[in-house]
């Protein structure tokens, strides 16, 4: 799941932990109430077969799959202008990397799969994402399972 707080937030938002997993009761058979909780702006299930029915989200790429969202950063660098202001995140199990617009219109999320372009940009055929980093200039780094660090680069 991806949670979002406005920049003027005072903090202390309640995203439902440990009663919810995304927008769903946890454990599933519990009778949970969501009053006072802030729902995530995006989620996908561990079982990718259900992503197409996920709460009516409009996605550019309906083939999202994975097991665990690996959080990233809002891109503030200058090397890839098309990503400026977008939240970059990935999946721990598949190595896929997406970006999502983060603005006031969280009802109409624009989700873009950058995986193939990133693989070309870092010169690899596959990549397994374990973490992200960001430098003082807003450029983003990708860390793989083996500890190698790559500059975020996109080649079309």
Task: Give the ranges of each region predicted by the language model.
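Beta-propeller domain segments
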Residues: 1-112
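Conserved blade-ending motifs and adjacent loop-strand segments that build the rim/top face
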Residues: 69-70, 106-136
